[in-house]
A protein has these predicted regions:
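Catalytic core and acceptor-binding pocket of nucleotide-sugar-dependent glycosyltransferases
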Residues: 187-199
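Phosphate- and divalent-cation-binding pockets in alpha/beta enzyme and binding domains
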Residues: 13, 60-63, 113, 177, ...
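Conserved beta-loop-beta/alpha segment of the NTase-like Rossmann-fold superfamily
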Residues: 61-140
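Residues at secondary-structure transition points
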Residues: 20-23, 29, 33, 84, ...
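Short loop/turn motifs at secondary-structure junctions
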Residues: 46-47, 72, 97, 148
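Well-ordered alpha-helical segments embedded in enzymatic catalytic cores
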Residues: 34-37, 89-92, 198
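N-terminal glycine-rich phosphate-binding loop and ensuing alpha1 helix
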Residues: 1-61
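Conserved core of the sugar-phosphate nucleotidyltransferase
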Residues: 111-189
């Protein structure tokens, strides 16, 4: 299994705090950055290969990745990061995504028990949602039906909708099917949307 971390965005909603570094290089309590924490937890969970998409500040991400010699880290640059969303970065990374996939957004901070639990679950395809939290205004929500994920968007409401956290465990076949749909969006020039639009 490989991990894919999306870190090609500008982080514009964070204003001046991301002027000199990407969101994933934001320091948490104790001084550890989000990216460092994610890589540390991935390594601890037994992941050996990580693909990271990059936009601005590639060098900062590379320097952090170099601190983990047990991880084979591949950086995939998105030269169009200013004009595209991470659906395009996902597409650019396709050649490296030839395995089961653990996919997460680069600004997520999660408990140390999460990844081992997700990886140990016998289900091949897993996504994370929280039925106890109120729906966020601007962040991801999901719609479920019959226990299966039907839709992920920032613009959902109503019955069957829940707060969603973009962490996915995907079988190789499921990841490939999603990437096929992503390729259709890219071919149509529809690169300003979320990768979840192509689910």
């Amino acid at each position: 299994m490989k991990a894919l971390i999306f870190n090609s965005g500008l982080g514009s909603r964070m204003g001046d705090s991301t002027r000199s570094h990407p969101k994933c290089m934001t320091e948490l309590t104790g001084g550890e950055t989000i990216l460092h924490r994610q890589l540390r937890l991935l390594a601890a969970a037994g992941i050996c290969e990580v693909v990271i998409t990059t936009g601005p500040f590639r060098e900062q991400l590379a320097a952090t990745a170099a601190q983990f010699p047990s991880l084979a880290v591949t950086l995939i640059d998105n030269p169009r990061y200013r004009e595209t969303n991470y659906i395009y970065s996902f597409h650019l990374a396709r050649a490296m995504l030839d395995d089961d996939l653990l996919m997460l957004h680069g600004d997520l901070v999660f408990d140390e028990t999460l990844l081992p639990a997700v990886l140990a679950d016998p289900q091949k395809d897993i996504c994370l949602y929280d039925p106890t939290r109120p729906l966020p205004e601007k962040d991801f929500k999901c719609r479920l039906a019959d226990g299966e994920l039907r839709e992920v968007s920032v613009n959902l409401s109503g019955n069957g909708c829940y707060t969603f956290q973009p962490v996915y465990k995907l079988s190789k076949a499921t990841a490939a099917a999603w990437l096929d749909r992503v390729a259709e969006f890219v071919a149509a020039g529809d690169t300003g949307v979320y990768a979840e639009n192509a689910l």
